[in-house]
Amino acid sequence: MTEGQAVPGVGDWEIDVESLDLEEDSCGTPLRATPPQEPSPAAADGEEDEDEEEEDEDVEDEGDGEEPGVSSEVPGRPEQPGGLAPRPPPAAQALPAAAAAPERGATAGGGAEPRKLSRTPKCARCRNHGVVSCLKGHKRFCRWRDCQCANCLLVVERQRVMAAQVALRRQQATEDKKGLSGKQNNFDRKAVYQRQVRAPSLLAKSILEGYRPMTAETYLGGTLPLPPPVSDRMRKRRAFADKELENIMLEREYKEREMLETSQAAALFLPNRMVPGPEYSSYKGTYSPTAGELPSKDFCNFLPTCLDLTMQYSGSGNMELISSNVSVATTYRQYPLSSRFLVWPKCGPISDTLLYQQYLLNATTSVQALKPGTGWDLKGTRVQDGLSAEQDMMPPKLEGSLVLPHLPEVPASRTDLQVHQVVPERSAFSPPGRNFSPIVDMDCLAAQGHVLTKLSKENTRPSLPLKTNPFHSVFQQTLSDKSGPELNAPFVKEAFEETPKKHRECLVKESQKYTFTIDRCAKDLFVAKQVGTKLSANEPLSFSVESILKRPSSAVTHVSQ
């Protein structure tokens, strides 16, 4: 009886454990029917840690490829204590017998049950050491939890790899749930980012290309643009990050382009082919031309040099203001000048006549080249060839209207004051010290020097610096019938007593086209004189953009009348 009581006690303990396992696992696995003594307390205590170990179970469930083999072993192990299992039915306990009978039938039936056994995760560390333990709630109480053997290290590494794969699959699953909308958003985001990146690259490309050739729309006549010799090379150099190398290459590019432009200067400065002021000044002001670039065969080639000389006076604030003023371009277009003379806009103060000074230098040397002597015939033919296109453009009606009606009314006091002014060491006739292209031949400079010596010897009164006076002293030969009585200085008559007669004879014989040009230049001079006041050379300009824009328009109305 004692044995019979003891046996049911053991059977009761086993049945209670099995019933707990059946309640935990809805599948009703027969594996846990007779657990071994070692993992049984772990399984009993593991009920508390079920929620904490679910993720590890998933990893082990996917990672264990050896479960089918374990399932074949486990059904054999309950056979050892299987002798205890038949003992409870003779004990005449209905509930334990009812609980044990289905397990025996399930174990004997086989069939679908072994497949369910493989689904139960087991502890891999315990398996390495020959023990099968259920993983649920087993992690904290595993005997080989901190084992460092080779097999356990391999298990740990495999678990890490499987966890990474699970995380990757979960991320991909969430992306698939979002569908194509997420991908479309990514594409839009990439497109916006690429647009933001490409905009500065286009700007850098335009900067690296340097001075781009002006298109045909910038010209009034629509001439061909300058050839772009370096744009392809600059595009290939966009990957370079050396700023110093970029500056050197751009400087070389400017010089090459300047040489090409000077060869086409005559075509660019025709009346219908004016270059806008800001573009020309921004390009020309960067690099000063070297000597010998301009050929002196054509008479009209002094015009780019004239602009270069005015650009060299950028040290004063007046020149910078005028060259950077946008109204310069409009005054270029509003002046109805001939094709061989380009006049800077008329400014009020005398200090602004620095702009006129270089033009006067070119104009007076060209007129002195026409004096009777060695170069008269040659220069006359050059001027005739150069001005042949002007005769068709100018109607003869403009002859009387080119000179303004207030020209004879210039006060004699101002004329005498400007006639008797001292010729400074550096006047409009003195060659500038900077390097620039030769304007006329050497015989013209020799004649000019002769006039300079006469003027400097006979003139002794110190006065204001000579600025617009050379223009008046030269062009009074054509206006002697109008303003001649007002000129009382004897040295002017001595210097140019032969020039007016022969010059007028030449103009009468040939045509009146050159007189038109000189009268127009004289008109601009007198307008500048009357507007001007007695100011020092270093005073700032007293004009605005509106005043500059208004004055040429009034001059145009005078000429049209």
From Swiss-Prot:
A GO term (biological process) for this protein?
myotome development
Q: Which GO terms describe its cellular component?
A: nucleus
Q: Where is the composition biased (Low complexity)?
A: 68-85, 92-106
- The segments labelled Disordered in the record are 1-119
- Give a single Pfam family match: DM
Keywords for the protein's UniProt record, in alphabetical order: DNA-binding, Metal-binding, Nucleus, Transcription, Transcription regulation, Zinc
> What happens without the gene?
Mice heterozygous for Dmrt2 mutation exhibit no visible phenotype. Homozygotes are perinatally lethal due to signs of respiratory distress. They have rib, sternal, vertebral and skull base malformations. Expression of myogenic growth factors, such as Pax3 and Myog, the growth factor Pdgfa, cadherin Cdh2, and the filament protein Des is abnormal. Mutants lack most or all of the epithelial organization seen in wild-type somites, sclerotome and dermomyotome. Mutants have disrupted production of matrix components including laminin-1 in the dermomyotome.
Q: InterPro entries from the entry? A: DM_DNA-bd, DM_DNA-bd_sf, DMRT
Identify the DNA-binding region of this protein by residue numbers.
Answer: 123-170
Q: State its location(s).
A: Nucleus
Instruction: Specify the superkingdom.
Output: Eukaryota
Is this entry keyworded Zinc-finger? no
* Any GO MF annotation of the entry: RNA polymerase II transcription regulatory region sequence-specific DNA binding
Summed up, the tissue specificity of this protein is:
Expressed in testis.
Q: Which family does it belong to?
A: Belongs to the DMRT family.
The record ties this protein, via PANTHER family, to: DOUBLESEX AND MAB-3 RELATED TRANSCRIPTION FACTOR DMRT (PTHR12322), DOUBLESEX- AND MAB-3-RELATED TRANSCRIPTION FACTOR 2 (PTHR12322:SF122)
Give the function comment from the record: Transcriptional activator that directly regulates early activation of the myogenic determination gene MYF5 by binding in a sequence-specific manner to the early epaxial enhancer element of it. Involved in somitogenesis during embryogenesis and somite development and differentiation into sclerotome and dermomyotome. Required for the initiation and/or maintenance of proper organization of the sclerotome, dermomyotome and myotome. Is not required for sex determination and/or differentiation in embryonic development.
Q: How does it assemble?
A: Homodimer.
Record-given protein name: Doublesex- and mab-3-related transcription factor 2
